[in-house]
């Protein structure tokens, strides 16, 4: 595993010893330390640059580094150990975030009410257009009408008689008296299949369409029907077409053919336009010749539903056979063989966290018959990297910034070209002899081996660094050296690069089949009061979206799956969501965007997230898996993305499983106290529900091949069943919260609920104090959300769900208390709410483990997506429909046949709303 990015000061053993001091001392002595480091480094580098040998330091025993992780004393300031105890009071940010969540919840409810009042958009296409008639000419049809039998056969709905009781509406299809094959407008003859410009509204660019019908309506008016082409700016991408971020640019001559059609009066036609269809996989030279003499070209189709840009199956523009519902399914069920799949694909997990997304994708792909291997992972959080590496030992896990990872990939390609692809033996022939012939100074020694590589983009000397193992010294004396310092060691560099390329420690373009990741966009956070609404990408906190797309552009994987919060579709008119979609389309990827709710795939939490598929034109565009559990989806999306919710149509009545509740998830786990120091323990009981039996399965039964055919460590043990320890004051408070559904701080002595559900002090009850002298009911609880909140010290219940799994476990302003115990939910309980298998072990302080779990993509959602990915990769789906109905056996694959013990967990609480 690669270490974290180096700090601004060059790490040496001298600086490493200083950096092992307390953080306060580091801060006070930082400038002095940098001067010392700079001086010592300069001297040593002069020696190394001339000889490739290292000055001998004063030996010192170093603390052992965590396996696969960076030694803190060498390359960065030591991070203080986080105290795994709940803070005494919520800080200002915590309270503000809570109020922001409450406001968002209220706004979501208002959106739902407004949507209900306005009527459901259903499947209405928002891309409809009506052209404005103009001109003084008299357009006319040419020739005889199409034979009646042929016309009735080709356009049957045009000749259906409408009942007198039904008044025609705007969306109703016009009725025809007869059809024609050609027409004349402004003395120009137009035929069926011609591409034309059509008059648009005022201040709008002319529409572009393909004529599919000429007919005389029952009202004696002359009409034509157009199948519309969309410019990039006419699609959901909209204004993002004009931006230019790191080469992201659309070809103005490129248009997209849609299935959208409208009827317009004949004199709306302006002129012909020459449009050619280009195979997206055509050779660039042939493509350039083909489009040289045309006005426009198209290589993909566009659909408003799921903001889809996809291949066109044939040159005549037919989009293939589509079912009426837009849903495909596999009634054959799943193969449940325990053998490892034969077909393999490689995965790069960016912003991986502890690996929830890639783990789920691999599990789902295995069910489809594809062995998807997480070969590389990148994340800035060292604890998350440690967790991922432990659970996926074959993965090259890099603890570094994504932009430095990209810079390293480009430098790695240069090194591979120099030391692997070219014949460098002649150039290096005398290098080893020269190195051996050099006389060693008494304060120097020889480079034994290079054992790591990274890119430093923040230090004084930017560029590639190698981790050097020095001859005669142990691993605690390894150091990072810039490549310039190793100019006299080309054989060592060649040896490292050739071995690294053989092992593929870093991917080159063409090595990666799938890239997944969720680039953080903290610049759109509600707590960020300085959000840049006009140009979100200029906010440094949103730049990772650009980096993610830059990595995609460089590596050109077959598939891309980006996950993010729904706010990317809401903030600044969906700027970031549109940017991501626009980038993929500009890079000639097929693309599709959908919103999925975790609870719909077998979890007792809501959590709605955005998932963006991308697929090379040579591959099948994956579908979205339809829900398998009966969860009511609430909370809308902006109008531009109103048709992107992955759900069944309102008219459909699918057979879904009953929504899961908290009791289904963790009612089998043993009781633990507020302070639980053991991260490994026994279950002490059997599973009680189907979910619990499944979540306890081992890796092989889950089709998790991270450890090959072998069972992984700790299987069968209960891991990370530890709560964040409440401080003494909060523990006293929690012990007085009643064990009942809906209990919270309002049940404590001295609190009274007044008008409008606002809490107030009970004048008849003297204020109660804790043993520390602090009040039983803290002031912040009384004032939170203007006294209307039910969240402070709120207790969950067995028959409920949670809106989302949080990254912090403090009970001050959220409902997170265990249903029957005086503590918050444990890490394992939260992990189950995210669908992590029980064998998945986490590393780091307790607070860090909560963060890893809360930031992860829900594993069952990723698993369902992985199944659809596998089907597309293997060519077992055609990509023509956006949705896929999972086989009935999908939710029970791999589960044991043991009957569940009866357990009463209540009934579903009904609709759930994301907060």
UniProtKB/Swiss-Prot annotation:
An annotated GO BP: methylation
Biased composition (Low complexity): 1-14
Gene3D superfamilies: 2.30.30.490, DNA Methylase, subunit A, domain 2, Vaccinia Virus protein VP39
Skewed-composition ranges (Acidic residues): 81-107
Function: May be involved in the CpXpG methylation and in gene silencing.
Cysteine pairings via disulfide bonds: none
SUPFAM superfamilies in alphabetical order: Chromo domain-like (SSF54160), S-adenosyl-L-methionine-dependent methyltransferases (SSF53335)
Top-level enzyme category: transferase
GO cellular component: nucleus
Family: Belongs to the class I-like SAM-binding methyltransferase superfamily. C5-methyltransferase family.
Chromo domain sequence ranges: 445-508
Composition-biased stretches (Polar residues): 315-328
Keywords noted in UniProt: Chromatin regulator, DNA-binding, Methyltransferase, Nucleus, S-adenosyl-L-methionine, Transcription, Transcription regulation, Transferase
Compartment(s): Nucleus
Record-level Gene Ontology MF annotations: chromatin binding; DNA (cytosine-5-)-methyltransferase activity; DNA binding
Recorded catalytic activity of this chain's protein: a 2'-deoxycytidine in DNA + S-adenosyl-L-methionine = a 5-methyl-2'-deoxycytidine in DNA + S-adenosyl-L-homocysteine + H(+)
Keyword Disulfide bond appears in the UniProt entry: no
Biased composition (Basic and acidic residues): 21-30, 71-80
Major localisation: nucleus
UniProt biased composition (Basic residues): 42-57
Active site (record annotation): 521
UniProt protein name: DNA (cytosine-5)-methyltransferase 3
């Amino acid at each position: 595993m690669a270490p974290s990015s180096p700090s601004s000061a060059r790490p040496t053993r001298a600086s490493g010893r200083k950096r092992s001091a307390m953080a306060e001392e580091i801060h006070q002595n930082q400038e002095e330390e940098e001067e010392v480091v700079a001086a010592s480094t300069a001297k040593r580098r002069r020696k190394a640059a001339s000889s490739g040998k290292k000055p001998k330091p004063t030996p010192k025993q170093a603390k052992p580094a965590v396996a696969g992780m960076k030694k803190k004393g060498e390359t960065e300031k030591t991070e203080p150990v986080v105290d795994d105890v709940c803070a005494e009071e919520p800080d200002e940010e915590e309270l503000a975030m809570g109020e922001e969540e409450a406001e968002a919840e209220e706004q979501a409810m208002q959106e739902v009410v407004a949507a209900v009042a306005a009527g459901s958009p259903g499947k209405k296409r928002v891309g409809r257009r009506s052209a404005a008639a103009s001109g003084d000419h008299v357009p006319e049809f040419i020739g005889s009408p199409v034979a009646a039998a042929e016309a009735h056969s080709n356009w049957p709905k045009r000749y259906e008689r409408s009942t007198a009781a039904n008044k025609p509406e705007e969306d109703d299809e016009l009725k025809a008296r007869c059809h024609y094959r050609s027409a004349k407008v402004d003395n120009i003859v137009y035929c069926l299949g011609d591409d034309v410009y059509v008059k648009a509204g005022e201040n709008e660019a002319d529409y572009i369409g393909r004529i599919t019908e000429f007919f005389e309506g029952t009202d004696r008016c002359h009409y034509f029907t157009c199948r519309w082409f969309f410019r990039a700016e006419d699609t959901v991408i909209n204004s993002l077409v004009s931006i230019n971020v790191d080469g992201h640019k659309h070809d103005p001559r490129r248009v997209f053919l849609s299935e959208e059609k409208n009827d317009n009066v004949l004199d709306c036609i302006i002129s012909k336009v020459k449009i050619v269809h280009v195979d997206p996989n055509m050779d660039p030279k042939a493509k350039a010749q083909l489009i040289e003499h045309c006005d426009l070209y198209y290589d993909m189709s566009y659909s408003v539903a799921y903001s889809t840009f996809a291949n066109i199956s044939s040159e005549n523009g037919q989009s293939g056979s589509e079912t009426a519902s837009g849903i495909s399914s596999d009634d054959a069920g799943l193969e449940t063989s325990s053998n490892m799949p034969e077909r393999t694909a490689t995965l790069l997990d960016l912003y991986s966290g502890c690996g929830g997304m890639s783990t789920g994708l691999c599990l789902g792909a295995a069910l489809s018959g594809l062995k998807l291997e997480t070969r590389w992972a990148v994340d800035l959080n060292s604890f998350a990297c440690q967790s991922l590496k432990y659970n996926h030992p074959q993965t090259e896990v890099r603890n570094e910034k994504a932009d430095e990872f990209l810079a390293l990939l480009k430098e790695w390609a240069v090194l591979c070209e120099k030391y692997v692809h070219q014949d460098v033996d002649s150039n290096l022939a005398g290098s080893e002899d020269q190195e051996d012939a050099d006389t060693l100074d008494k304060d120097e020694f020889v480079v034994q081996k290079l054992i790591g590589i990274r890119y430093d983009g923040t230090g004084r000397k930017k560029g590639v660094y190698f981790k050097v193992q020095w001859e005669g010294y142990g691993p605690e004396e390894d150091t990072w050296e810039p490549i310039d310092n190793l100019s006299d060691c080309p054989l060592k560099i060649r040896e490292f690069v050739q071995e690294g390329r053989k092992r593929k420690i870093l991917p080159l373009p063409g090595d990666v089949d799938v890239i997944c990741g969720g680039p953080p966009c903290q610049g759109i956070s509600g707590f960020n009061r300085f959000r840049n609404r006009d140009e979100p990408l200029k906010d440094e906190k949103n730049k990772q979206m650009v980096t993610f797309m830059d990595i995609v552009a460089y590596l050109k994987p077959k598939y891309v799956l980006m996950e993010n919060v729904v706010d990317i579709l809401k903030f600044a008119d969906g700027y970031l969501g549109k940017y991501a979609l626009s980038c993929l389309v500009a890079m000639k990827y097929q693309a599709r965007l959908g919103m999925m709710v975790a609870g719909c795939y077998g979890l007792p939490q809501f959590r709605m997230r955005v998932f963006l598929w991308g697929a090379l034109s040579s591959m099948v565009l994956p579908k979205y898996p339809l829900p398998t559990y009966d969860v009511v989806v609430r909370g809308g999306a902006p109008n531009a993305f109103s048709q992107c919710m992955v759900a069944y149509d309102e008219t459909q009545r699918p057979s879904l499983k009953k929504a899961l509740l908290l009791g289904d998830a963790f009612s089998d786990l043993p009781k633990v106290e507020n302070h639980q120091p053991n991260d490994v323990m026994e279950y002490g009981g059997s599973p009680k529900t189907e979910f619990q039996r499944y979540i306890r399965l081992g890796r092989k039964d889950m089709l998790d091949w991270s450890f090959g055919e072998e069972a992984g460590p700790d299987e069968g043990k209960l891991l990370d069943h530890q709560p964040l320890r409440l401080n003494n004051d909060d523990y006293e408070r929690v012990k007085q919260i009643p064990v009942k559904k809906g209990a919270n701080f309002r049940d404590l002595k001295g609190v009274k609920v007044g008008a409008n559900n606002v809490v107030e002090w009970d004048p008849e009850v003297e204020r109660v104090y804790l043993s520390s002298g602090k009040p039983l009911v803290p002031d912040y609880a009384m004032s939170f959300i203007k006294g209307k909140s039910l969240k402070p010290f709120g207790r969950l219940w067995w028959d409920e769900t949670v809106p989302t799994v949080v990254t912090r476990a403090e009970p001050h302003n959220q409902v997170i208390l265990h249903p029957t115990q005086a503590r918050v939910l444990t890490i394992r309980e939260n992990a189950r709410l995210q669908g992590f298998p029980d064998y998945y072990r986490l590393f780091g302080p307790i607070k860090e483990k909560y963060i890893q779990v809360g930031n992860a993509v829900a594993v069952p959602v990723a698993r369902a997506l992985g199944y659809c990915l596998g089907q597309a990769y293997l060519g077992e789906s055609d990509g023509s429909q956006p949705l896929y109905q999972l086989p009935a056996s999908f939710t029970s694959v791999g589960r044991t046949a043991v009957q569940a013990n009866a357990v009463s967990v209540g009934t579903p609480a009904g609709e759930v709303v994301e907060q």
